[in-house]
């Protein structure tokens, strides 16, 4: 596979979801217009918010949309509702699948494999589950995946719970899965920190997609 250039952003600050979503859309449109433009990777943390996919069931929100205490965004991705917050590492990939494999199922499974490799680096045993998208430790979900795709240019990506307030998931039915238990990496490896996980995420994505990263 020929190496592709990808712009990578790894902010140290906690980012507002909508700002980063708009940035993804800009890079997606740039690739649609000219696929010689670089792919785009964003790795960071968000302020507390909830996001829903295109066909999400609002019944999976256990609070009123009229409640101003919650930031809710309906976005261009599959899947049901999830939660983002500090202490959770989010990775967005805006890339041209025509350069890899024009198969969304392949891409979802590829992301699961990447997450399993990331956690394996920290000696955390985890797995995917037949019939579901994401990664689990035992019966607890540790990572969620949601993607959108337009003309084979992807958007959104995955989140891994590192050391976040899992109680925030009690406000929703996570990913539409009843009685879904969530987990943090820190509960399985006390020695890790989010900056080290971020470094490993970057490394494994670079290896798996043969990227030449350019910071911007």
Swiss-Prot record:
Task: List, for all copies, the residue spans of the domain called BPL/LPL catalytic.
Answer: 35-213
For this protein, what is any one GO molecular function term? lipoyl(octanoyl) transferase activity
Q: Name one GO biological process term.
A: protein modification process
User: What pathway is it annotated to?
Assistant: Protein modification; protein lipoylation via endogenous pathway; protein N(6)-(lipoyl)lysine from octanoyl-[acyl-carrier-protein]: step 1/2
Q: What is its EC number?
A: 2.3.1.181
**Catalytic reaction list:** octanoyl-[ACP] + L-lysyl-[protein] = N(6)-octanoyl-L-lysyl-[protein] + holo-[ACP] + H(+)
Entry keywords, A to Z: Acyltransferase, Cytoplasm, Transferase
Q: Kindly list the places in or outside the cell where this protein is found, as annotated in its UniProt entry.
A: Cytoplasm
List the catalytic residues. Answer: 175
Q: Kindly list the residues the record flags as site (Lowers pKa of active site Cys).
A: 141
Organism domain of life: Bacteria
Q: Does the keyword ATP-binding apply?
A: no
Residues annotated to bind substrate: 77-84, 144-146, 157-159
Give the transmembrane ranges.
none
A GO cellular component annotation here is: cytoplasm
**Tell me, what does this protein do in biology?**
Catalyzes the transfer of endogenously produced octanoic acid from octanoyl-acyl-carrier-protein onto the lipoyl domains of lipoate-dependent enzymes. Lipoyl-ACP can also act as a substrate although octanoyl-ACP is likely to be the physiological substrate.
- Additional record remark: In the reaction, the free carboxyl group of octanoic acid is attached via an amide linkage to the epsilon-amino group of a specific lysine residue of lipoyl domains of lipoate-dependent enzymes.
NCBIfam families linked to this entry: lipB
Which HAMAP family does this entry report, sorted A to Z?
LipB
Q: Which family does it belong to?
A: Belongs to the LipB family.
Name of the protein in its database record: Octanoyltransferase
Q: What is the lineage of its organism?
A: Bacteria, Bacillati, Cyanobacteriota, Cyanophyceae, Synechococcales
State which gene encodes it: lipB
């Amino acid at each position: 596979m020929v190496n592709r250039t990808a712009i990578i952003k790894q902010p140290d600050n906690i980012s507002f979801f909508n700002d980063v979503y708009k940035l993804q859309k800009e890079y997606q449109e740039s690739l649609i217009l000219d696929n010689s433009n670089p792919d785009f990777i964003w790795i960071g943390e968000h302020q507390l918010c909830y996001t829903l996919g295109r066909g999400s069931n609002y019944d999976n929100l256990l609070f009123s949309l009229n409640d101003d205490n919650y930031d809710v965004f309906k976005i261009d991705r599959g899947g049901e509702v999830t939660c983002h917050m500090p202490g959770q590492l989010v990775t967005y990939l805006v890339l041209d699948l025509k350069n890899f494999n024009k198969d969304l199922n392949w891409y979802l499974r590829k992301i699961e494999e990447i997450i399993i490799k990331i956690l394996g680096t920290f000696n955390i045993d985890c797995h995917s589950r037949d019939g579901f998208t994401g990664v689990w430790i035992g019966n607890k979900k540790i990572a969620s995946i949601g993607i959108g795709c337009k003309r084979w240019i992807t958007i959104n990506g995955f989140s891994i719970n590192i050391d976040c307030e899992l109680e925030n998931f009690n406000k929703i039915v996570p990913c539409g899965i009843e009685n879904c238990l969530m987990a943090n990496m820190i509960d399985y490896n006390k020695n890790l920190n989010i900056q080290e996980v971020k470094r490993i995420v970057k490394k494994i994505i670079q290896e798996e997609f043969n990227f030449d990263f350019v910071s911007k």
